[in-house]
From Swiss-Prot:
Keywords: ATP-binding, Cytoplasm, Kinase, Metal-binding, Nucleotide biosynthesis, Nucleotide-binding, Transferase, Zinc
Source species of the chain: Pyrococcus furiosus (strain ATCC 43587 / DSM 3638 / JCM 8422 / Vc1)
Binding site for Zn(2+): 128, 131, 148, 151
Positions of region (LID): 124-161
Function, as annotated: Catalyzes the reversible transfer of the terminal phosphate group between ATP and AMP. Plays an important role in cellular energy homeostasis and in adenine nucleotide metabolism.
Protein name: Adenylate kinase
Length: 220
């Protein structure tokens, strides 16, 4: 089973993606994780990508395509892809790769949240720069305000988590996703999921769909 999962900033798509990985034994491919790894390692490519994110801009397709296709070559099947593709050019790159390797996508899940909810969720996020632990000032606060529970380091807010940047990211995302959504609707694999509510509530909107797909595959 191969899955695409989308959602604007703060939609919780990565949290749901990891639940999907645990339940169905898929490989998790996250464009965000691949990008953050490059940034954390301070590579020239990472520094270039950080500059785009700090301005609230999307990273160029050529860079993202290279990261994703490189990962796909090592995985090939039974994966969930988080946050990719986001532009028509990325769709073309992905579709060309999948066609050349005889791979199909079973479902494209779009988790929707409003702009207001996106800002509330994302702007409250805090990151430990030392160990990578993630907190939220409202939903998952550290025991000592501003300090990591794991290593005690001072927590920081990522540049792209500031409210004004979140709003810009959200609007860019929604605009760019219009043709992507239309493409997967034509493929008859697009499913829109209400992302409002807690993690378990959203999960129970997703799980029955994937159980059905998995059971359908088992019967073929």
């Amino acid at each position: 089973m191969n899955i695409l999962i989308f959602g604007p900033p703060g939609s919780g798509k990565s949290t749901q993606a990891r639940r999907i990985v645990e339940r169905y034994g898929l490989t998790y491919i996250s464009s965000g994780d691949l990008i953050r790894k490059e940034i954390a390692e301070g590579t020239p490519l990472g520094r270039e990508m950080q500059a785009y994110l700090a301005r609230g801009d999307l990273i160029p397709d050529t860079i993202v395509n290279t990261l994703i296709i490189s990962k796909l070559r090592r995985v090939r099947k039974d994966f969930i892809m988080d946050g990719y593709p986001r532009t028509p050019e990325q769709v073309i790159a992905l579709e060309n790769y999948l066609y050349d390797h005889g791979i199909k996508i079973d479902v494209a899940i779009d988790i929707y949240v409003s702009l207001e909810e996106s800002i509330r969720r994302v702007s409250g996020r805090r990151i430990c720069p030392k160990c990578g632990a993630v907190y939220h000032v409202e939903f998952n606060p550290p025991k000592i305000p501003g300090r990591c529970d794991v290593c005690g380091a001072e927590l920081v807010q990522r540049e792209d988590d500031r409210p004004e940047v979140v709003e810009k990211r959200y609007r860019i995302y929604m605009k760019n996703m219009e043709p992507i959504i239309k493409f997967y609707q034509k493929q008859r694999i697009y499913v829109k999921i209400n992302g409002h509510g807690n993690i378990d509530e959203v999960w129970e909107r997703i799980r029955p769909l994937l159980d059905y797909i998995r059971n359908r595959e088992a019967m073929i």
